[in-house]
Amino acid sequence: MGRNRILLNATASLLATMALASCGGGSDGGGTVAPPAPPMSTAPTIVVSRVFAALTFSQPTVLKQAPGDSSRWFVGEKNGLIRVFANNPSASSSSTFLDITGVVDASGEGGLLGFAFHPDFPITPEVYVSYTRSGAPLVSYLSRFLSNDNGLTLLPGSEDPILTVLQPQTNHNGGDILFGPDGYLYAGFGDGGGSGDPLGNGQDDENLHGAIISH
């Protein structure tokens, strides 16, 4: 008798649970559970708008402003030019900030690939430029250039090479450079190129390819 009572109690509890689940809280008594509302999207809204529509550049590789100066933009072109123009939506002309087209090898994935203003520019009138230089073999140059007109232009003849790195291939030639908040200059030169990373440069901590250096 006791066993039958336990079975009856268990059956009653199960039926009650099923009945509650079928109710679902719907107001129409139909027993249908509404699906949960989808989570609100947290993705940012991105709008692409054309700016400086009156300006055109040849294979631009870098776009940046000098420290503390929002009045101008500087554009590096693959062929070895750095051009400057006013930060005005209606700007229609640009001028040459630096021209080293005569020494830059812009073939393959090389060219003028990066530049960085000294953090105190133009008080300290130095700009660092990273590019691949014409000649054989192909070599990446990290050089310092000076301004003698309060930062309006750079002197091509003032070039002071800081570091040179041999490039065994004409692809994967890196060259982005920037100053960190610690005041050091950081630079990379790519992984040395070649299909399938044949030299394993990225895993070699004694090789400047596939690395970031500080100066």
Locate the predicted segments by residue.
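Acidic, Gly/Ser/Thr-rich repeat motifs that build Ca2+-stabilized beta-propeller blades
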Residues: 25, 29-30, 35-196
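C-terminal motif of bacterial Sec signal peptides marking the signal peptidase cleavage site
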Residues: 20-22
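Bacterial N-terminal signal peptides that target proteins for export
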Residues: 1-12
